[in-house]
Amino acid sequence: MVDTGTDRVKRGMAEMQKGGVIMDVVNAEQAKIAEEAGAVAVMALERVPADIRAAGGVARMADPTIVEEVMNAVSIPVMAKCRIGHIVEARVLEALGVDYIDESEVLTPADEVYHLNKRDFTVPFVCGARDLGEAARRIGEGASMIRTKGEPGTGNIVEAVRHMRMMQAQIRKVSNMSTDELMTEAKNIGAPYELLLSIKETGELPVVNFAAGGVATPADAALMMQLGADGVFVGSGIFKSETPEKFARAIVEATTHYEDYDLIAKLSKGLGTAMKGIEISTLDASERMQERGWEKGS
């Protein structure tokens, strides 16, 4: 019989990351930089999203050796990505002892119809979402943490802003609905009714909701916090910048003090060049990672 963690325990682990920054790293050296800069966790992977996007082909779970090297290098929680629907990659990461698994659209999906039943696992999961319907379905499957999908590896914040604003607007809409309207709304957005009822009563998702996908500067991180994010994932924005150590520290500080504009101005001075960005409209439909895991049965 497979051991499974309770929602309360899994969600509690995610709550502990609230207000912080989670950084993508590809080796132990980068993990140490992230930890020293104040990251609350790191995401261990073979290539940051910008490199995955540039390389093309099939992107898979990282080599377990990389994951273990990162785990041995830092004392903060370590996350790792598996492909959408790939049961065995998820089980391997769980066996390695990672603190969190990201069932991620950044990697090439293994299943175009089904996401993982995350309730079958002891390890908690984070999943991406573009709107309340997607978030609710992932939570219904057992996700303990949600993040905006944004458009990974672009250094362009516009899609993360779109997704966060969409979710916040839909949460406000549900909160103001009468109970007898909820079933129709659940049908319309493909969300579990009981979850919408919980959102109506509390005015928020039952799990933390981080921003991800396109965060490249301290100002980007502060913007997402102001829009209602509980924290920030930074993928390519740190180690594709000119000065990773400076960007890492500045983004952590800006995430914490997201309404202190004098401080954010100071943090933004002399950082060097941010990662090269990509205009979203130049991407073909096949290059848009945010649409993965959605078109067929998300």
From Swiss-Prot:
GO terms for molecular function: pyridoxal 5'-phosphate synthase (glutamine hydrolysing) activity. CDD domains: pdxS. The active site is at residue 81. The keyword Lyase applies. InterPro entries: Aldolase_TIM, PdxS/SNZ, PdxS/SNZ_N, RibuloseP-bd_barrel. Its EC number is 4.3.3.6. It catalyses: aldehydo-D-ribose 5-phosphate + D-glyceraldehyde 3-phosphate + L-glutamine = pyridoxal 5'-phosphate + L-glutamate + phosphate + 3 H2O + H(+). The keyword Transmembrane helix does not apply. D-ribose 5-phosphate binds at residues 24, 153, 214, 235-236. Catalyzes the formation of pyridoxal 5'-phosphate from ribose 5-phosphate (RBP), glyceraldehyde 3-phosphate (G3P) and ammonia. The ammonia is provided by the PdxT subunit. Can also use ribulose 5-phosphate and dihydroxyacetone phosphate as substrates, resulting from enzyme-catalyzed isomerization of RBP and G3P, respectively. Belongs to the PdxS/SNZ family. This is Pyridoxal 5'-phosphate synthase subunit PdxS. It comes from Halalkalibacterium halodurans (strain ATCC BAA-125 / DSM 18197 / FERM 7344 / JCM 9153 / C-125) (Bacillus halodurans). The lineage of its organism: Bacteria, Bacillati, Bacillota, Bacilli, Bacillales.
